[in-house]
Amino acid sequence: MAAALLALAALPVGAAEAPLALAWRTPAGNELLELDRSRVLARGPLPAERQAPLGSLWKLFVYAYLVDRQQPDPGYQCLGHDRDEVYCCNPGERIDRDQALVKSCGLYFDPARLGVTPDDWSRYWQARSAPAWLQRLDALKPEARVPVADLLAQLQTLPAQDEARRVLLDVPLQARDAGVLATLGARLRVKTWSWLADADPQARQGGFAGWLNDGTPVWAGGPGTSQRVLGQYAEVLERTLPVSWPREPGSCVEVRLFSRYPLREVSLAGQSTPVAPGALRGRYQVLFENGNRLDIESQGELFLERRDDGLALTAHLEREDYVARVLDREAAPEPVEAAKALAVAVRTYLVQNAVRRGECLVIDDSSSSQRVAPRPASAASRTIAAWTADLVLAGSTVTYHSERAGPDRLSWQQAVTEAKEGVRYDSILARAFPRASLSRWDKPVAACQALPNAEDWLRRQRREWRPVLDAEPGYAEIPQFSVCRLASGRPHVDRERRRIFVRGLFSLQDRLDLTHEYLHLAFEAHPNGQDEAYVERLARQLLLE
């Protein structure tokens, strides 16, 4: 096995047959896997001599240094004078430290600009017994070749890694290929890297390094840019990476169980004597004032309290445990894609509706909000919660119902049907919440800044255009779509999410752009939808004649 791995490792990275190398730390030591786009080709110990270019991973170490030393964030203002600003922001815009890490903005992390001196840097990393290449600021270059084992060791103990993991969820969220997030979910918290290929300076190699969401250090490298690696290897990574409980499962959620049903007493299972208020451990039976009984189970997270209005049963849960318990109570962990969609909706409902009390979020267990299972979550639901950890929707109010769909409401029954048809969770959510975008818990940002006036205009015009459009081969009216503000670039459509990105509705050109892009959607199942000349001619006919 070791010989096979060394042979694979010796292949030029730019060669067509070169596999993706994936390394991580395990309890038994560092492990190296070699993968093609469909399977694991080889697995064995990570050779100590295995090296890779540092690429843009140097920015992760500068980020950790700045955050750990509590250095103020000076931001970076793009003025349009430096071509490397393409990795940062548009002229006139400003980027902060977290955004700079995700976008790999080297101009932000320039040590001289930040006032990081070689002596301060060296002392800081020497105190942490870092390898020599990390102690020298002048050696922290993208072309520097460093042992992969060193990278994994430093990631294991990196300062500020909790903050980095939180921020780096934006890497799959902002990936050019939407399939990365759809396939991998929230499991990878990694900084991407790219550099010149070893054997061909005209080619590229790239990958990522960081953590799985349980804190396991991970590194990957293969042919092509980092975005190409993520996109082309997402499917095999999905099958290879474990789904583990997150290292940071979220702040506490305080839930008053059975908030609408007064309690008479709580007793140990099989006994009739009521238990005293306090933390509960074991199996119990709840007797309600209406005479109904219910079995519950606690591992110390449920508390029986005596309040002015009677007995109360309160659960103190980690956020992701809360999501898993709601999933068990409101629906089921299967079909998996439907369950993933509902888990995101549950988490979003929590952040939109809970009341903050100190470090905890407070929400009732009620059919008018979200019902919570009064027992440990099933392993299957915990897996769904872990796979989607920290993912929420931004841009819409989120509700859900077991059967009824509606504006900004997810129907579990409909989600199940769509999942069985092969629809992935992100598309299930996009259909239920067309204006919303997947985002992260601590900083929900909507990718679609809705233009309601433009959407209303298009819907009105569409009714007038119907006689003309219905006569065109391949036309299919789109029942649900969103019109979003275009931040930069050319007008376009996101077919998967049914979104039209335009500048506004201020001029004739804006209206032409909006009509043109809508027609691309409406003819997407017909060759006419790919014919730019046809689409533009029809758009002008509709607007100008």
Residue map of PLM features:
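Catalytic Zn2+-binding segment of zinc metalloproteases
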Residues: 69-70, 518-534
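Active-site SXXK
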Residues: 50-74, 100, 256-258
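Short alpha-helix carrying the canonical HExxH Zn2+-binding catalytic motif
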Residues: 54, 58, 506-522
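A short, well-structured edge-of-sheet supersecondary motif
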Residues: 16-44, 208-213, 217-221, 483-484
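Conserved, single-site charged/polar hotspot
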Residues: 15, 165-189, 197-205, 209, ...
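Active-site scaffold of zinc-dependent metalloenzymes
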Residues: 478-511, 524, 538-540
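Post-HExxH zinc-binding segment in Zn-dependent metallohydrolases
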Residues: 90-91, 95-99, 461-477, 526-545
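Active-site-adjacent helix/loop patches that line small-molecule binding or acyl-intermediate pockets
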Residues: 18-22, 76-167
